UniProtKB/Swiss-Prot annotation:
Gene Ontology CC entries for this record: ribonucleoprotein complex; ribosome
Organism: Acholeplasma laidlawii
Name this polypeptide is given: Large ribosomal subunit protein uL16
Domain of life from the UniProt record: Bacteria
Protein task: Binds 23S rRNA and is also seen to make contacts with the A and possibly P site tRNAs.
Length: 10
């Protein structure tokens, strides 16, 4: 999935 700039993931 496409991850946003700032989330729980790095």
């Amino acid at each position: 999935m496409l991850m946003p700039k700032r989330t729980k993931y790095r």
